[in-house]
Amino acid sequence: MYQKEHEEQIVSEILSYYPFHIDHVALKSNKSGRKIWEVETDHGPKLLKEAQMKPERMLFITQAHAHLQEKGLPIAPIHQTKNGGSCLGTDQVSYSLYDKVTGKEMIYYDAEQMKKVMSFAGHFHHASKGYVCTDESKKRSRLGKWHKLYRWKLQELEGNMQIAASYPDDVFSQTFLKHADKMLARGKEALRALDDSEYETWTKETLEHGGFCFQDFTLARLTEIEGEPFLKELHSITYDLPSRDLRILLNKVMVKLSVWDTDFMVALLAAYDAVYPLTEKQYEVLWIDLAFPHLFCAIGHKYYLKQKKTWSDEKYNWALQNMISVEESKDSFLDKLPELYKKIKAYREAN
């Protein structure tokens, strides 16, 4: 009881910094280190969000949110405090206040919705340009760090292969080892290909215009309003190439389908390209990132570190089989970039 009263007192104090009359407050969500309260005010319903992160990091995100809002991206308005701050916080906890927006759920299996999402991603990347964080904020950047990231993931994969070999009777480990050598080889080839690509050139261009990525581009952050995607919140961002978001989105879609659908990929990339055109050399960087076995590495990471404590062995085994199916079926397009690049541009022109 004391903890609940203490929490209510903190929330009340946080809300007192905003220029609204508060009618009612109710805890709406509490998961993954984040709490969300629905707040009824004299200016309509709001959402107060608490995150376990330093205020300097939250400031980097909330100022980016305001930047996107100023650029006209469809995004829930973020509110400033009476003193003009975009967030509040102490030590490791931060708070921000947004308008509550409601719309139609967006799903990965809806082809037309996904095309709209890819188009939205293009608008997002355009709107992100020119963002310069303040000195008080703590920025996050992966620009120029792909080589290091790839090497780290490959080292972890090799380590997980050794762990798997020590559990010969474990079903997950048996399946993992059957495919690990191929995934390791493909990852090493992607690392080599990165050296021969225009990754460094694209990185320098991105550094100059200051664009950022969503980092965790998931449909849970979006809703559909009047037939178009609308961003409910900016969960996390990082300075990086826009292709990072494309890789994450495409992988998420294909995992839902349990197989890589090359024709669908072309249609999705064409929708993005119509808003944010990429050169063939830039698509080559995306192809390299898609070739790297991010999905296979991720499920191994989760299993051997026991990150999903609520998952059963059956769920882990199903997830592994699904990741393998998607990773293996990528062979159908990875060596066809020139042909598929032309298809993406032609599809874009035809639609």
Curated annotation (Swiss-Prot):
Leader sequence residues: none
Annotated GO CC locations: endospore-forming forespore
Protein keywords: Sporulation
Main location per the UniProt record: other
Family annotation (SUPFAM superfamilies): Protein kinase-like (PK-like)
GO biological process: sporulation resulting in formation of a cellular spore
InterPro entries noted in UniProt: CotS-like, Kinase-like_dom_sf, Spore_coat_CotS
Domain of life from the UniProt record: Bacteria
Location relative to the cell: Spore coat
Family, as annotated: Belongs to the CotS family.
Function field: Seems to be required for the assembly of the CotSA protein in spores.
UniProt-listed PANTHER family: SPORE COAT PROTEIN I
Protein name, per record: Spore coat protein S
Species annotation: Bacillus subtilis (strain 168)
UniProt lineage: Bacteria, Bacillati, Bacillota, Bacilli, Bacillales
Gene name tied to this protein: cotS
